[in-house]
Amino acid sequence: YCGQLRNKVVLQRKFPKQGNPYWDYPTVASVCQSDRFNCTCQNHSRPMRSCNNLLLHEIQNYGNLGEPATRNRPLYNGSPNYPLGNCAEQHAANDVLNALDKKNCPKSLNDLYFSRARYVRDSRELDACVNCRTILPNAQ
């Protein structure tokens, strides 16, 4: 998936009049899968515009969407407090939950499994942030 994102940016730089205007690489990409219902989605980090109700309810236990966590957040030494809903894992989980809604499947955050997050620019692996590990039980 990181390779697809890099190729998309290269094409947009070559042909700036087609499609979206020039943009830089997203920071992080992740893949989410629901084995129980055979659904896989991939996404990258950016601000979240709309959120599945199940994920939104869980996010709101820790603060408001788009703002750093303010409530019930476990403290890890030196870990940054990213805005809730900006992470690639949360976007991928949102896509899977929306796909399961369309199939009328029962949903649970415990049924979602995640790949290791990767930096898009060079595909280095990255540990999930504190917010993702708190909100999404199986985030790595």
Label for each model-derived stretch:
Residues 77-78, 98-140:
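Active-site or metal-binding loop neighborhoods of secreted/extracellular toxin and effector enzymes
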Residues 77-98:
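Acidic helix/loop or adjacent segment enriched in Glu/Asp that either coordinates divalent metal
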Residues 1-81, 101-108:
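Glycine-rich short-loop/terminal segments
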Residues 26, 45, 86, 123-126:
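Processing junctions and N-termini across compartments
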Residues 9-10, 28-31, 96, 120, ...:
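Extended aliphatic helical segments
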